[in-house]
Amino acid sequence: MSVIVVAEFPMTEQGAQDFIDWSKNADGYVITRQHKGFEDIRTFLAEDKKTVYLYEKWDSKEDHQAYLSFRVENGLMDFLNPRLDGDFKVTYFSEE
């Protein structure tokens, strides 16, 4: 059964736009879509123009965590840290 992942990123307004731009380039979701277990990803920008939400669907929590590890090892936090305006949060949900 698939797992739903919701990630919340509190960012500066410019940081949110940088993240959205990054997601659309060759280093963004193009790579995400190639990972084992990937099913879907959608990006939402809150009304404050600073909080980015990701809605993701993966085959399993383990597949998503392996993907996150890959991203961290390849410099994602170096990109995110100067743009974040607080701690980001990842929550896992099961479909009932």
What are the residue ranges of the model-derived segments?
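Solvent-exposed beta-strand sheet faces enriched in polar/charged residues
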Residues: F44, T91-F93
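Short, surface-exposed ligand-recognition loops at beta-strand->loop->(often short) alpha-helix junctions
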Residues: P10-S23
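An amphipathic, aromatic/His-enriched active-site/gating alpha helix that lines ligand/cofactor pockets
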Residues: N25-E39, K57-T91
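Non-catalytic surface loops within mature trypsin-like serine protease
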Residues: M11-E13, S60, S94-E96
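Absolute protein N-terminus
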Residues: M1-S2, E96
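Short, well-ordered beta-strand segments in beta-rich or mixed alpha/beta enzyme
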Residues: V3-P10, E39-L68
